[in-house]
Amino acid sequence: MANFLLGWELGGGLGHAGRLKPLAAGLQARGHGVTMWLRDLVQTERLLADLPVPRLQAPVWLHRTVGVPEPQVSLAEILLGFGYLQPHTLRPLVQGWLAALRLSRADAMLVDYAPTALVAARIAGVPAASVGMGFWLPPAQVPIPAFRDWQPIAPGRVARAEQQVLASINGVLRHYGTAPLPALWQLFGGDLPLLCSWPEIDHYPRAPDEVVDWLGPNYLPEGGQPPQWPAGDLTEGDGQNDGPRVFAYLKAGHPDHAACLHALVAAGCRVLCYLPEVTSGLKPPVLSPRIHYASSPVDLGLAFAEADLAVCHAGQATVAQALLAGVPLLLLPMQAEQFLMARQVERTGAAINAAMRPRPAGFGAMLDQLLTQPACHAAAAAFAQRHAGFHHATQVADLLDRLDGLARRANAAGSVPAKHATP
């Protein structure tokens, strides 16, 4: 048996902790020790409340970095804004993760979007696995491709940022007497990359000869309240089963969230909407008998079993569960990672990426296409059929088997946690 440190450093929302939760529970059930170091302890408290493992605050960058291009166009530029500008700004974060390894007496590490933890693991000689989607498990290319590829990028910009980040990492590694990192892409996967995606929803183009082990999306498949669909407008028809059922997971930060809800009502839809800001007390943006606002997160498996359409911001967990249920999507991405996901899903024919349409957004026409034309439903059904053999429980068991192998590797190497590198 081994002690695992589970870490999350970058990114927001609940998806990162949601990916780690079933793996933490599974490792513990198999007799391993687990300690979680999380970017956000407050927002994840409810999600992880039933998980009996120690949870501590991860070492994270708290400052605004001057001199980083806006907006960032590559993973390297993101890292420049999170402490990787110079070796002396990165080193304290690495020291924090080294301390986390010592305090956890870690024999092995599993991270979700935690590159600095992976730097520390290289220094400490701790075998490390990295789980997640393609955005932070990039292709084996130098430099790593830009993700904001829809806008002009000055020649050499991506390569220069990557060289600067690599210089900072290698400066820290040199301080600890550790071999340099040859290429930045080699950092993100650690010793055991666990790419939880499929080619159709991958964020990057990958070379045909790159060997990729596609494990399918990893998410929490259950939990939340059962779906409660509105009855519809009692003045129209019999008021029962009136109009297509649409599950909408929206956030008030998107400028078109209210316009989209108005369009759904105008299209005669019955909308079950989870809008986190409303659950926190914000006045609902659109009031209609055709919209029911959920008071807490909804069980997506149950919702998509009954839905005719999904509307969301293109987070992988929501998109994957909709597609596996054969439900087409209207996607309203809020940032680059989501835009890439939305673009990929639209290419399958199973979705419309609203961010690719002219503004002001013509939601009426988009909804008409998604609800009345068979092509999108057929594409979503075809996606579900292609991946009909995918089951979350089987995937989790496979991931745990791989992590067991990492633990055996740690034990064979004779890892001695007390001797992890010190400042």
Please give the residue ranges for each predicted region:
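Conserved nucleotide-sugar donor-interacting segment of glycosyltransferase catalytic cores
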Residues: 91-155
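Active-site-proximal region of nucleotide-activated glycan assembly enzymes
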Residues: 127-203, 209-210
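Conserved nucleotide-sugar donor-binding subdomain of glycosyltransferases
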Residues: 71-110, 114-116, 157-184
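A short, glycine/small-residue-rich beta-strand->loop->alpha-helix junction that serves as a flexible
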Residues: 8-21, 253-254
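C-terminal amphipathic helix plus adjacent low-complexity
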Residues: 185-187, 365-423
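Donor-nucleotide binding loops and adjacent catalytic segments primarily
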Residues: 24, 202-309
